[in-house]
Design a protein with these regions (language model features):
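Alpha-helical interface subdomain recognition
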Residues: 1-84, 93, 106-111, 122, ...
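N-terminal glycine-rich flavin-associated loop
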Residues: 88-110, 137
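A short core secondary-structure module
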Residues: 157-207
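Flexible, small-/acidic-enriched active-site or ligand-binding loops
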Residues: 142, 201-231
Length: 399
């Protein structure tokens, strides 16, 4: 086994790693391979985490959560990915953990008291955030889905893309314009967040789902969603009307650090698979791992991953810094480094396997698909570099 215990963890991080690792040990490589191939959500895995309260890792203790911080979340999600679940396995619970953040920070006390304890216990899932739109893409302020006040309700109409896990969620957080873009001084104004009861939306005939036939992260389904006169009670507005975009930004950097940790876990998994195969496979009378053409790409992948890992875990300790721009720099750097390292590592693992690299039975083809995805989500590598160029290097804004 490749030694990757290179980061000094706190006592609490070690406790999280061990507890979550024990759960992950119950789900082997075959479990994830089969669920990915079938496009099946891993209910057993997620339920096992929920039963131990891990979906409430970031929720305050007063609402039944564990009350932990980004440091512990990084350890938790890294452990899940590294266990064999990969990036997609971590993504099956990632949203359940982070979609509650707007409610914690901005929701009414009545809403928090009712819903958050159920989220912490796993009895209610907020697995879905509906933001991206076909025309807006990464330009989130350009969304056109609108929410119009009608008495004690909002009526929502619009179309969203890449809305994931709506098929396994009880609620979703929806971003919509409550003031048209042309009527606000800043393009970041006029967006609001809403908590949507998915079952109620289906019963009213206001949700139309079209599943996207994608090639990565098979255990998580994604959809094009059309909202047709969806009525949402006014008390399900999260926070202050027209300030939803700022609510989305709050906590975004911390989430990117967790994404980076998941990505590092995936990359280490790929390197280990490559090393194991390189030691076992013999050609021309010797193990292929004896050849530098095999050794060097795997060694380089390992080195890059350990650098990204060190940066990610170190940055997680600094998320309480009041300088949010600095936290943003750490988060975007970690995300960029981790995605580049994981992709190179997964590619090396596939190449090491030769023709077997595209055989599902060896898993590395899945790791490569997932590693490629990490260069696109939650933001592209180019957007991460844009942030660094403008906010760290002091270069002119490019967009």
């Amino acid at each position: 086994m490749v030694a990757t215990d290179t980061v000094q963890l706190t006592d609490r991080q070690r406790s999280v790693r061990d507890a979550v690792g024990d759960i992950c040990d119950e789900f082997d490589a075959a479990y994830w391979r089969e669920h990915d191939a079938e496009g099946e959500y891993p209910h057993d895995f997620v339920n096992a985490l929920a039963e131990e309260g891990w979906l409430g890792v970031l929720l305050p203790e007063e609402y039944g959560g564990k009350g932990y911080s980004t440091e512990e979340a990084v350890a938790m999600m890294y452990t899940i990915a590294r266990s064999g679940a990969g990036f997609s396995g971590a993504q099956t619970v990632h949203a359940a953990i982070y979609n509650s953040a707007p409610l914690v920070n901005y929701g009414s006390e009545e809403l928090k008291s009712d819903l958050l304890p159920r989220v912490a216990s796993g009895d209610a899932w907020i697995q879905c955030f509906s933001l991206t739109e076909p025309k807006a893409g990464s330009e989130s302020t350009a969304i056109e889905t609108e929410a119009v006040r009608d008495g004690d309700e909002y009526v929502i109409n619009g179309e969203k893309l890449w809305t994931s896990r709506i098929d396994v969620s009880d609620y979703l957080v929806l971003a919509a314009r409550t003031t048209p873009r042309e009527e606000v001084e800043k393009k970041t104004e006029g967006v609001s967040l809403f908590l949507v009861d998915i079952e109620r939306g289906h019963e009213a005939g206001s949700l139309d789902l079209e599943e996207i036939d994608k090639t990565a992260s098979g255990v998580v389904s994604s959809f094009r969603v059309t909202y047709d006169d969806l009525r949402v009670p006014a008390d399900r507005l999260i926070g202050v009307e027209d300030e939803g975009f700022y609510q989305v930004l709050d906590g975004l950097n911390e989430e990117r650090l967790v994404i980076a940790a998941e990505t590092v876990g995936l990359g280490e998994l790929a390197v280990e698979k490559g090393v194991d195969y390189a030691n076992e496979r013999e050609v021309f009378g010797r193990a292929i791992g004896q050849n530098q053409a095999i050794q060097h790409p795997l060694a380089a992948g390992h080195a890059r991953l350990q650098a990204a890992k060190q940066f990610t875990f170190a940055a997680a300790k600094r998320t309480g810094d009041e300088d949010r721009k600095a936290v943003g720099a750490w988060a975007n750097t970690a995300k960029y480094l981790a995605a580049e390292a994981a992709f190179e590592a997964a590619d090396a693992a596939v190449q090491t396997h030769g023709g077997r690299g595209i055989d599902r039975a060896y898993d590395v083809e899945r790791y490569l698909r997932e590693a490629r995805l990490t260069r696109l989500v939650p933001v592209t590598q180019e957007l991460a570099l844009n942030y660094l160029g403008e906010n760290v290097l002091g270069l002119p804004r490019s967009y």
